[in-house]
Amino acid sequence: MVNDLTPHFEDVQAHYDLSDDFFRLFLDPTQTYSCAHFEREDMTLEEAQIAKIDLALGKLGLQPGMTLLDIGCGWGATMRRAIAQYDVNVVGLTLSKNQAAHVQKSFDEMDTPRDRRVLLAGWEQFNEPVDRIVSIGAFEHFGHDRHADFFARAHKILPPDGVLLLHTITGLTRQQMVDHGLPLTLWLARFLKFIATEIFPGGQPPTIEMVEEQSAKTGFTLTRRQSLQPHYARTLDLWAEALQEHKSEAIAIQSEEVYERYMKYLTGCAKLFRVGYIDVNQFTLAK
């Protein structure tokens, strides 16, 4: 266990508080910034993002009146979908000021009797009991040294029949790359350093084994693991295409340097998923 459980506000805000207008140039209308799920070949990105959200929510066993905690809630699409489809109360946690403001505004505009809150806070600061937990694309930012604490906190605030749906990018150890026949190239080393320093400071994707072992130690039972690897390559391709189509606007909102950096990130990550250096998995963890 680590002693300093202060959320990584600066690391997260360095990326996610760049500019909502900039992200809107390449994200779908739901502003979902994670892997989509293309159930059908003819799906639009928006349809595939909603399908991914439905895939995650469908694994939780939600019932009307339950309270769902969304850790790393982004711009709120998962919570709004949960209210609409499952009639549940929601609490969202984000470390991004821009996201918190966006979610609060969208909540204020909703016509529903269900409770809905968004907090500018990390899981480290949240101790309220909830019925279910979903976390999509946030675990990668926690750091390996906080995995045990995260699972302990999730286990503590869930009821005896509670479920945690963890959707996270997963990586390979150097030895696993060798075992899979993946070349350890200079490009790979440089690109991973670029991602860690210029795109997601503090980001540390876990291995599949890390998630399975740490969650089990806390008392969770893994009931299902589902890989969406090819879906993330396609998602990133579509983001890169959209950003390229809006190049002039992107440069006007930010700069040419930021535009080029994001194009390098999106196209490079698509390659990593396509070749198999990284994966993305949904872990269904029952208490």
UniProtKB/Swiss-Prot annotation:
GO cellular component: peptidoglycan-based cell wall; plasma membrane
Root EC class: transferase
Assigned EC number: 2.1.1.79
Pathway(s) the chain acts in: Lipid metabolism; mycolic acid biosynthesis
Superkingdom of origin: Bacteria
Active site: 269
Disruption phenotype: Disruption of this gene suppresses a cyclopropane group at the distal position of alpha mycolic acid. Mutant produces fully cyclopropanated methoxymycolates, but the efficiency of cis-methoxymycolate cyclopropanation is reduced, leading to accumulation of unsaturated methoxymycolate derivatives. Cis/trans ratios in purified ketomycolates are unchanged. Cells lacking both cmaA2 and mmaA2 genes cannot cis cyclopropanate methoxymycolates or ketomycolates.
GO molecular function: cyclopropane-fatty-acyl-phospholipid synthase activity; methyltransferase activity
Cited Pfam families: CMAS
Keyword Acetylation: yes
Coiled coil: none
UniProt keyword annotations, A-Z: Acetylation, Lipid biosynthesis, Lipid metabolism, Methyltransferase, S-adenosyl-L-methionine, Transferase
The reaction(s) this protein catalyses: a 1-acyl-2-(9Z)-enoyl-sn-glycero-3-phospholipid + S-adenosyl-L-methionine = a 1-acyl-2-(9-cyclopronane)-acyl-sn-glycero-3-phospholipid + S-adenosyl-L-homocysteine + H(+)
Regulation: Inhibited by S-adenosyl-N-decyl-aminoethyl (SADAE) and thiacetazone (TAC).
Keyword Zinc among record annotations: no
Residues bearing the modification N-acetylvaline: 2
InterPro entries for the chain: CFA/CMAS, CMAS, CMAS_actinobact, SAM-dependent_MTases_sf
Residues that coordinate or bind S-adenosyl-L-methionine: 33-34, 72-74, 94-99, 123-124, 136
GO BP term, pick one: lipid biosynthetic process
Cited function: Catalyzes the conversion of a double bond to a cis cyclopropane ring at the distal position of an alpha mycolic acid via the transfer of a methylene group from S-adenosyl-L-methionine. MmaA2 also catalyzes the biosynthesis of the cis-cyclopropanated methoxymycolates. Cyclopropanated mycolic acids are key factors participating in cell envelope permeability, host immunomodulation and persistence.
Recorded family membership: Belongs to the CFA/CMAS family.
NCBIfam families for this protein: mycolic_MTase
Protein name, as recorded: Cyclopropane mycolic acid synthase MmaA2
Organism: Mycobacterium tuberculosis (strain ATCC 25618 / H37Rv)
